[in-house]
Amino acid sequence: MAERESGLGGGAASPPAASPFLGLHIASPPNFRLTHDISLEEFEDEDLSEITDECGISLQCKDTLSLRPPRAGLLSAGSSGSAGSRLQAEMLQMDLIDAAGDTPGAEDDEEEEDDELAAQRPGVGPPKAESNQDPAPRSQGQGPGTGSGDTYRPKRPTTLNLFPQVPRSQDTLNNNSLGKKHSWQDRVSRSSSPLKTGEQTPPHEHICLSDELPPQGSPVPTQDRGTSTDSPCRRSAATQMAPPSGPPATAPGGRGHSHRDRIHYQADVRLEATEEIYLTPVQRPPDPAEPTSTFMPPTESRMSVSSDPDPAAYSVTAGRPHPSISEEDEGFDCLSSPERAEPPGGGWRGSLGEPPPPPRASLSSDTSALSYDSVKYTLVVDEHAQLELVSLRPCFGDYSDESDSATVYDNCASASSPYESAIGEEYEEAPQPRPPTCLSEDSTPDEPDVHFSKKFLNVFMSGRSRSSSAESFGLFSCVINGEEHEQTHRAIFRFVPRHEDELELEVDDPLLVELQAEDYWYEAYNMRTGARGVFPAYYAIEVTKEPEHMAALAKNSDWIDQFRVKFLGSVQVPYHKGNDVLCAAMQKIATTRRLTVHFNPPSSCVLEISVRGVKIGVKADDALEAKGNKCSHFFQLKNISFCGYHPKNNKYFGFITKHPADHRFACHVFVSEDSTKALAESVGRAFQQFYKQFVEYTCPTEDIYLE
């Protein structure tokens, strides 16, 4: 997994071509933009798409980018300087076994390994095949037990299951029972596939996960490759177990490897439960103008995965290609159609409960009995990855308060965005039309109040947006009736009122508890909504306050620096310090804010730097300030672990804070019309005075006389 992440990081994007803040009227030079591009996986936002990106990096189906091991002359001279070659060179150390299989020059080694493994097994003769021989006769295995599926042949391990298992045994890793060994073999043997008779593949055949290119000068079009990570031994065993339906036709010399690949794909359509299974790209129905196109070209065979996994919520968007699933690619399709989704190796829809479509010629017609019970999908995640369960809700429905369907990755990925180069310029394609539900820079203020995922929500303390987990890193304070009050409690659960006197709560809402009744109901003021009411006591917890002696020391100091800035947002980061973490957070927030700047501009605020900490006071209009209560956000200085401005654009400033109770960190990003060097120096001065006062209190130098 670490190698995959390093390989992904190798595709760092180039500097953006335009400013992310097109709606901000800031008197600044034209080069006012982020110029320090950091790979987006250098900090975690705990979103499902990053988990998908880490686990299924080979899902990106693109003819210029292949992250699978090189097969059949993939690394040709024409593609040596491309970005795909560079990425593939870094991904050679992935956790797949036999990464160098099927490369030109490795065919002899593969046959030698087959001979050695066959010699070690009693009763199995060596396969009669040579490096330059057509692989079709290999399906007529001469050894006893190789012509039928009755004899179990152990395979080389491709997953964590290091010991061979007998058929129908229990998979102790995934708690999945293996499927039947003979049913799929019989179906494959009964199929009348043109691939087994030496015919060429259709001209528009779909490119599966590997998206491999044929060698230069080869007349064979790109073949349909399987999704398994089998070793050469397993591939030879799979082809031997499938008896030919007729006399095999010997392919020309230049087509030997391609024909073998087709036979291998035919035999390995159904994978076992112990292998890693990668999802195939999402399909779409052929265009009316292209009745002969059975499958999409490779540049359009891009999978779309949304963080809201409701299959019934998707609808068909005619005439638009499929974007990629990762945030580094430019498109993100939240309108994937279930009719276009096909599992690995067939056009069946057993998961959706629909009748199977007409089968392809290369597959068996007896696919109606297949279901997700026969194939177990394994999700491989990092040990530190966190999955968040979200409810299933329609994509076209109104965005509710707890909606997670409009995540930052939905909004960050717009193909026609000039700032898309900050996410991934190497994967750019032709501009694609955006679905109507995805936000863009064309959004207007009269649109509904769209709420982003709480994993990645920009914090605007003006009450217009939902609270996020980043707000629990500090303390709220409000001026109520001319007197400033600090937050006393924080909501830990959502509470939906059922009576008029009850107070609605969202997670992490700042609360000012005014009365604690004996029946375990609190009467409180919600600083986010400005409403009062009662709620159950166990729906909120008391916030951590600074010690009284430290508060007294801070009150004795009258030094306060104020700076006028614009608050861009907050994002959770994995580390408490580092310029790379700070720049990555600035990059992510700037990209996100660019898409919402028209209907939700950044809030003007005043940063107050003192010995106590950093206070963010929202500077609203006078009319709004007269109507409501003025709120601010406060971060104790002891919880601030790192601060600084962008090394290549000092108009951006950010600081990292630690959660008072949990081991979590968040970065808060601001932008100013002028340089923020003075702001960073002021925070450094506050640190020095705070440390001096803390040392004087804890380690006094006065002589102490005891009577």
Swiss-Prot record:
Q: Where is the composition biased (Basic and acidic residues)?
A: 263-273
- Copy the domain comment: The SH3 domain mediates homodimerization.
The chain residues annotated with the modification Phosphoserine are 14, 28, 39, 148, 177, 183, 189, 191-192, 210, 307, 324, 326, 336, 351, 362, 365, 403, 405, 440, 443, 465, 467-469
Motif placement: D-box 2: 360-368
Q: What does this protein do?
A: The JNK-interacting protein (JIP) group of scaffold proteins selectively mediates JNK signaling by aggregating specific components of the MAPK cascade to form a functional JNK signaling module. Required for JNK activation in response to excitotoxic stress. Cytoplasmic MAPK8IP1 causes inhibition of JNK-regulated activity by retaining JNK in the cytoplasm and thus inhibiting the JNK phosphorylation of c-Jun. May also participate in ApoER2-specific reelin signaling. Directly, or indirectly, regulates GLUT2 gene expression and beta-cell function.
Q: Where is the composition biased (Low complexity)?
A: 13-24, 71-87
Q: Where is the SH3 domain?
A: 484-545
Concerning PTM, the database record says: Phosphorylated by MAPK8, MAPK9 and MAPK10. Phosphorylation on Thr-103 is also necessary for the dissociation and activation of MAP3K12. Phosphorylated by VRK2. Hyperphosphorylated during mitosis following activation of stress-activated and MAP kinases. Ubiquitinated. Two preliminary events are required to prime for ubiquitination; phosphorylation and an increased in intracellular calcium concentration. Then, the calcium influx initiates ubiquitination and degradation by the ubiquitin-proteasome pathway.
CC per GO annotation: axon; axonal growth cone; cytoplasm; cytosol; dendrite; dendritic growth cone; dentate gyrus mossy fiber; endoplasmic reticulum membrane
**GO BP of this protein:** negative regulation of intrinsic apoptotic signaling pathway; negative regulation of JUN kinase activity; positive regulation of JNK cascade; regulation of CD8-positive, alpha-beta T cell proliferation; regulation of DNA-templated transcription; regulation of JNK cascade; signal transduction; vesicle-mediated transport
Q: Which UniProt keywords apply?
A: Cytoplasm, Endoplasmic reticulum, Membrane, Mitochondrion, Nucleus, Phosphoprotein, Repeat, SH3 domain, Ubl conjugation
Q: Name one GO molecular function term.
A: MAP-kinase scaffold activity
Q: What induces it?
A: Upon neuron differentiation.
Q: What is the lineage of its organism?
A: Eukaryota, Metazoa, Chordata, Craniata, Vertebrata
Motif D-box 1: where?
Answer: 349-356
* Protein name per the record: C-Jun-amino-terminal kinase-interacting protein 1
Give the region (Disordered) as residue ranges: 1-26, 69-367, 425-447
The species is: Mus musculus
Source species, domain of life: Eukaryota
Q: Where in the cell is it found?
A: Cytoplasm; Cytoplasm, Perinuclear region; Nucleus; Endoplasmic reticulum membrane
All copies of domain PID, residue ranges: 557-696
